[in-house]
Amino acid sequence: MIPKFIAFQFKKPSGLFGIFSSNLMVKRNQKNYDRLIKDLNLQSQDKILEIGYGPGVGIRMIAGLNSSCTIHGIDFSKLMYKIATKNNKEYIDAGRMKLHYGDFLITSVLDNDYDKVFCLNVIYFWDELKSPFAKVLSLLRKGGTFHIYMADQNTLVKMKAPDSVFNKYSIGEVVEALEAAGFENILHYSEKGLYIKARK
């Protein structure tokens, strides 16, 4: 069973426990990022947004793989903003990356012409899917894609992740919410978790 306090640190890391959870994220998420970034199918001049960048592992990987991408990110943990900014200083200084601190649902700092938007292990922390998916749709250019990685519902149940922190969505619920938001060509597959792709 995951204690509620620890679970909340995965949602919004802060303080010393936040640093610990950040280090754990780096180790646990590496392979998931490898697969998700492969699915992004990076192209020259892509403009990319990560929602919930954590310590900045994924965006750093993208910056290292494709020097022509413009990379933006937003996270509502001030600690993660500080750590990710430090970890990606060279890309930020070079003007290739821009990181924001805040809630992506209410912020006005993001653009509306991203080629790809992605999030990894974030969806559980949204109490409903209608508003987040509508927001993502508004941030994408026509033909742009939204990529999600999430642990499957059964895994979260077995982990005994607290319901007060983790929303244990089924793949059916996610697909239905994506369709309702206006996404098309929704694809998903399972590989030690669920990978989902949807097109605007």
Q: PLM ranges: what are they?
A:
Residues 17-37, 167:
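Conserved SAM-binding loop and adjacent beta-strand
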Residues 105-117:
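A short acidic, Gly/Pro-enriched loop at the edge of an enzyme's catalytic core
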Residues 116-128:
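A short SAM/SAH-binding and catalytic strip from SAM-dependent methyltransferases
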Residues 130-142:
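A short glycine-rich, Lys/Arg-flanked "PGG" loop and its adjoining helix->strand segment in the class I
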Residues 143-150:
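Conserved beta-strand signature within the Rossmann-like core of class I S-adenosyl-L-methionine
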Residues 166-181:
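Short alpha-helix
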Residues 183, 189-200:
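Core SAM-dependent methyltransferase catalytic element
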